Amino acid sequence: MNKKKYIITLAGTVIGLFAIFVFVNYKIQYSELEGIPNYTEIKGNIVIDRFKYEKQPSLGSSEAKVKVVEFADFKCPACKNWTATYFDQFKKDYIDTGKVQLYFMNYAFIDRDSILAASAGEAIYHQSNDKFWDYYKKLYQNQGKESEIWATPKFLLNFVKNEIDGIDYEQFRKDLTEHTYMLDVKEDYKTAGYYGINGTPQFVIDDQVVRISSYEELTRLIDQKITE
């Protein structure tokens, strides 16, 4: 075999092995989601006619003049960036001062493990609103790659056991594995679609979806509402 043919053969072998590796890794990742339903498989009656603030995790005074809803996916890198870069400042300037009450709604659209991560958040929220916000910040800090299946049952159970204290872990485990709050996640998803949410993070200010490209634009719109 001459040198040129050897190089071509070697390159073909490497490409073939890489393709096999990618395929096997893909199969392993998706095997972790066995038994996790997609939205069409989550059954139950859902009526979307308004933002149901009373069903959402919240921060701030119920007497705040402005209500802001954040739609997010726990697998979304931009959502992680928003939380890491702006959340603490937003909380200091608007929530702690009583100007804004912030709500969270799931728009879990990236993959089925997005839905599972969202349902884990719902399970924690139904035990403690405050502990939900611990989960919110810490899960983003431990976020995996968007293109990979990482928010698996095993990961989420271990994560919550090690990182979120002050909840009934056995109740959480039961709710996660039995998909207790999957319908709540689907309701959030349907609400997002009803109001035209098409990405994350996106925000709603006093029932109005706003299209923004920067933190400064978000706070400017909030300031306008405060002074109205």
How would you name each of these model-derived features?
Residues 1-39, 71, 87, 159-228:
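C-terminal cap of thioredoxin/glutaredoxin-like
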Residues 6-14, 39-50, 64-67, 81-86, ...:
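Short N-terminal helix-initiation segments at or just after the protein's N-terminus
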Residues 26-62, 67, 92:
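N-terminal, intrinsically disordered, polar/charged segments of Gram-positive cell-envelope systems
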Residues 51-54, 60-62, 77, 85, ...:
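Surface-exposed loop/turn and secondary-structure junction residues enriched for glycine/proline
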Residues 56, 105-108, 144, 173-176, ...:
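Conserved short-loop catalytic and cofactor-binding motifs
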Residues 68, 76, 203:
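Conserved S/T- and glycine-rich ATP-binding loop of Class I adenylate-forming
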Residues 72-74, 80-161, 195-198:
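Structural alpha/beta surface segment adjacent to cysteine/selenocysteine redox centers
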